[in-house]
Amino acid sequence: MEDIVDQELSNYWEPSSFLQNEDFEYDRSWPLEEAISGSYDSSSPDGAASSPASKNIVSERNRRQKLNQRLFALRSVVPNITKMDKASIIKDAISYIEGLQYEEKKLEAEIRELESTPKSSLSFSKDFDRDLLVPVTSKKMKQLDSGSSTSLIEVLELKVTFMGERTMVVSVTCNKRTDTMVKLCEVFESLNLKILTSNLTSFSGMIFHTVFIEADEEEQEVLRLKIETGIGAYNETQSPTLSIDSLY
C-alpha cells in the first residue's frame, strides 16, 4: 500500500503529471490593459489587488510627463537644434555647455593677459596711420557702408520645425551686430505670432534666437516665409539713404 502511495505522489509532482492533474485555464482574450487598469471593484479581492498596479501606472505616467517637460525646457535654451529626440536634446545641451566653458576659459585667459600687461605698452604709436591719408570723401563712404551693415539683421540660418501638439519651433542664427537681439524681438512682435516662449543666446560672435510658436503643421512653410519677409522688410527700413551732402 505504501508503495502505491509513494508512486502516486511521485507522479503527481512530476512537471508533466502535475500539469495534467491540475486544472489550469488561461484565457488569451484577456487584454493586458484590463488586467492592470484597476477597473475592478475596489471592494472585491481582485480590485484591491489591482489598485497598487493602477497607482504605479499613474505614477509612471506622471514621471514621464515631468521628464518630457524638463526636456522641453532644456530644448528651449539650447540654440543649436539638430533633432527632436531625447538623446539629441541631451547631446546638444552637453555640447553647448562645453562650448560655453571653453569660451569662459578663453575670456579669463584674455583678462589675465590684459591685467599682466604694463600700461606703458598700451600707449599709442606716434607714427601716422595710413588711414589718415585717405581723402575725406572715401572715409565718409566707409562710415556709411559700416553703418548700414551693422544696422541690418544678417541671418545665417533659419529653421522652422513642427514638434507636434500645435507647436512650431523657429530657430534663427544671425551674426552678432549692434542691437541685433532687440531688432529680432521687434520683428517677431510685428508679425503678431502666438509665441509660447522664446530664448536669445549670444555665442562665438553669433546670436541664436529660438522661438516656440503655436501653429499647425500645415502652417510650417507659410510661417517660414512670413519670418523671412518680416526680417527683409525690417532691413529695408534700416538701410540709410545716401545723399551728396552727407559725404562732406
Swiss-Prot record:
Pfam families: bHLH-TF_ACT-like_plant (PF22754), HLH (PF00010). Expressed constitutively in roots, leaves, stems, and flowers. Residues 37-54 have a biased composition (Low complexity). Its main location: nucleus. Transmembrane segments: none annotated. SMART domains: HLH. One of its GO terms (molecular function) is protein dimerization activity. Residues 37-60 are annotated as: Disordered. The keyword Transcription regulation applies. Gene3D superfamilies: Helix-loop-helix DNA-binding domain. It comes from the Eukaryota. GO terms for cellular component: nucleus. InterPro entries: bHLH-TF_ACT-like_plant, bHLH_dom, HLH_DNA-bd_sf, TF_AMS/ICE1/BHLH6-like. GO terms for biological process: regulation of DNA-templated transcription. Residues 51-100 form the bHLH domain. It is found in: Nucleus. PROSITE patterns: BHLH (PS50888). Homodimer. PANTHER family: TRANSCRIPTION FACTOR BHLH35, TRANSCRIPTION FACTOR SCREAM2-RELATED. This is Transcription factor bHLH35. It comes from Arabidopsis thaliana (Mouse-ear cress). The lineage of its organism: Eukaryota, Viridiplantae, Streptophyta, Embryophyta, Tracheophyta. The gene is BHLH35.
